[in-house]
Amino acid sequence: MQERHSDRERYFDEQARTTEKYYIPYIRKCCPELPQEVLEVGCGEGGNLFSFAQLGCSVTGVDIAAGRIAEARKFFAERGAEGTFIASDIFKLTELEHKFSLILVHDVTEHIDDKAGFLKGLKRYLAPGGVVFIAFPAWQMPFGGHQQIAHSKVVSHFPFLHLLPSPLYKGVLAAAGENEPTIRELMNIKHTRCPIEKFQAALYSTGYRVVDRQLYFINPHYETKFGLKPRKLYGSLSVLPYVRNFFSTSCFYLVQPERG
């Protein structure tokens, strides 16, 4: 497992820096006046929300992992920031419906099996005119299987390993000494994978329009993590179906429900 995935406070701070430098400027492309009510679904420790809170936004984070929510509350309190954090399935929180001008969904979509159902459900939490910022790694990119969470140094640093056929991939994970929960999580990600084409099909089938899209050859978050300068994916590579997935380490979307 790469160190930042075990040091959650470091992970929080890295997320906050990337959000301030890249996510917020991207969102401001369509929302020059930053929305005041911000929800993050799958917020983890809350690092993405911290920079919004620093700008005076009212932030709410929801995650099914109670441990992550406890860490979010702790990290916010230690930094004197205000935020509401709830350990729950978002779709059980009817009191939050129609409240948020901005919803963040960062590195979550690739973990969800019913992507269309998830996207459709998100609409209930948007205020009129609200937007959703969605970011995810394309499945076929070098670490699209999240193998960096593995405990084995070989597995966690091995690009494209997740593209092996399922029985072989599972066998390699077991041979590398991964425990059952880690194997189960990595195999589940393989099942719920998110190629660009699959995501866009779910998006259009649930009545969203794309306000903006940017594919990245080098994920902006890699600057914080590895010191690599972000690189956008341009030209034919960005529009070639399937092929672009191998080169898109992060896919940014700003979307809204269709009017009418």
Regions found by a protein language model. Name each.
Residues 56, 82, 129, 207-210:
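A generic structural signal for alpha->beta connector loops
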Residues 112-113, 126-127:
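Helix-to-beta-strand junctions that scaffold the AdoMet/dcAdoMet cofactor pocket
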Residues 49-50, 71, 114-115, 143-145:
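Short glycine-/acidic-enriched loop or helix-start segments at secondary-structure transitions
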Residues 116-121, 131-256:
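S-adenosyl-L-methionine-dependent methyltransferase catalytic module, highlighting the catalytic core
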Residues 1-98, 102, 106, 246-253, ...:
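Conserved N-terminal segment of class I S-adenosyl-L-methionine
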